[in-house]
Amino acid sequence: MSNKQTKFIWVPAILVVILLGMIFYSAWQRRETKVSTSKNKITVVASLDSYGEMAEAVLGKQGTVTSIINKPNMDPHEYEPTANVAKQYQKADVIVSNGGGFDNWSLNFAKQNKTAKTINLARLYNYKDGTSGGNEHFWYKTDLTTRLTNQLAVKYSQLMPAKKTYFEKNAKNYQKKAEKLVDLQNQVKTRLNGKKLLATEPVFDNTLLALGADMQDQQFARAVEEGDDPTPSDVREWQELIKRGQIAAVIDNPQATGKLAKQGVDYAKAHDVPIVEARETKPAQTSYITWQMKQLNALNEALQE
């Protein structure tokens, strides 16, 4: 008799424990859902601050953006990422890389993050590394502001479908700001079309060629970019073009350190050829649009000399 009573006592007790467990689990699950919702933000990592600026503009208040190359004196080619940078890439929801052999460290980190949405500018522009005449400086593409912000809106919307309209609106707002840059590009194009230019490096070529410039002695520029000395033939061609008065301006990357590049600029100055600076990295405390407009305005003025 006592065994039966014990069984009757234990059965309700077990049911109570199970019921309480279900209640506590349900409450915990609701709490976890609430916490995850409150932290439902997008984390973005961009290899270059120019791309990071656009990523932040489109993202708005829906997350955070970290740009790795974020100082003008940082060399993307020689950059060695730290362990902290590796962690940032691992935690990222969206990764923006230049590609094209420019920031292989960023592409490698992106491959290791199996869940992140990725944007590779080289793929966006159907660029193949090693292609003759190819140029991996995609931030100088004249349609970059439209192409990248639209792509960012797509990636963000895949992560936050409810915010799709918000992201698209932010992209359009940035493109609206960039209209003054597009207007200036068109203005420069009328003066630049068909003009012969020299460059110490092909950094600015994506813009110049799109606006109709006739780039000369390109072997000189490519050699400097690769860290090599231009050949004596390249140097002679540089000097002959200048002596014959065929060059409207010389585009100089002030970050280039080659001796022959400096001599080429000095030779142009001695023959009263205008020098226009075009950097590889964005100056500090300057927006991408302002930076691009400053360089184009300098070119526009040089073409009027």
Language-model region placement:
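Extracytoplasmic metal-acquisition and chelation regions
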Residues: S2-E305
